[in-house]
A protein has these predicted regions:
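Intrinsically disordered, metal-sensing/regulatory segments
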Residues: 1-278
């Protein structure tokens, strides 16, 4: 997948979802909850199957240190959530909708943009195409919730769309920045890339588990068949990507191995032939 396509998918999925708040009833959240359940399960599975093994096998930083950075990312997201009020996992605060003019939620917007910026970092590390769709789907309810919150302020429609566009641009910006870091084009911080990735993994673990816990019924211990199907679908899609990539990887490795063995046999045959002539 080209960088242009990745940026387009990430930007327009969030932008269109945020703008949709002008046309869709905000009290109909059942579909959003199912989308959240799917994206939460997908993000969690991708993190466990791809991102965690990759950062531990980078061999640039000891595993114990990587674990500390993952915990740091988890705690960092806890702090961010205090300011964002959970909008990054689709919380729509309807209790404020009765007020015609709320104060502009600057802390929410900043923390949400920082969160979205960091989410773009794993996309530059290797083959992360499958993660693009997980993040894009995850941003649908987040952008919708942000749009709902901004509608309650004194801002006009054009300004609301502008702020939604700023949020939508954050993850593509994180992806481009991460790509520059991993290529060594931005400063001399490529050596810290695995630590940055570990922080993002901690954020993903917090976000995905929070989504899975909160996206069901009011009673979290009640079995919800639709939510369970959405969760299983998210895991199955990530597993399909994992198995497909694993097959390609093993097939790719098999080729050079056979080539090496063939070259070795050929050299051995030439050596015997030379001895026979001698």
């Amino acid at each position: 997948m080209s960088s242009f396509l990745i940026v387009s998918i990430l930007f327009f999925s969030a932008l269109l979802s945020g703008i949709a708040v002008f046309f869709v009833k905000r009290d109909n959240t059942q579909l959003l909850k199912l989308v959240l359940s799917f994206s939460g399960a997908y993000l969690f599975a991708i993190t466990v199957l791809h991102l965690i093994p990759e950062v531990y096998h980078s061999n640039q930083t000891p595993g114990e240190v990587i674990g500390l950075y993952i915990l740091g990312g988890f705690l960092f997201q806890l702090v961010l959530e205090h300011f964002s009020q959970g909008i990054e996992h689709g919380h729509i605060h309807q209790s404020h909708e009765g007020h015609k003019h709320q104060a502009f939620p600057i802390a929410i917007l900043i923390s949400l943009c920082l969160h979205a910026f960091l989410e773009g970092f794993p996309l530059a590390s290797g083959h992360r195409n499958e993660l693009v769709f997980g993040i894009a789907i995850h941003h649908i309810p987040a952008a919708f919730a942000l749009g709902s919150l901004l509608i309650g302020t004194r801002l006009n429609k054009q300004t609301i769309v502008l702020f939604i566009a700023v949020f939508a641009a954050m993850t593509p910006l994180g992806f481009i920045t991460s790509k520059g870091i991993s290529a060594g084009e931005i400063g001399n911080i490529a050596q810290y890339f695995d630590k940055i990735m570990a922080v993002v993994i901690g954020i993903f673990l917090h976000i995905s588990t929070t989504i899975l816990f909160e996206s069901g019924s009011a009673d979290h211990h009640t079995f919800n068949k639709k939510k369970m199907l959405a969760v299983l679908l998210g895991i199955l899609v990530s597993m399909a990507n994992f198995l497909f990539e694993g097959h390609d990887h093993s097939h790719h490795n098999h080729g050079p191995s056979e080539q090496t063995e063939e070259t070795h046999n050929h050299d051995h045959h030439d050596h015997d032939h030379h001895d026979h002539e001698h």
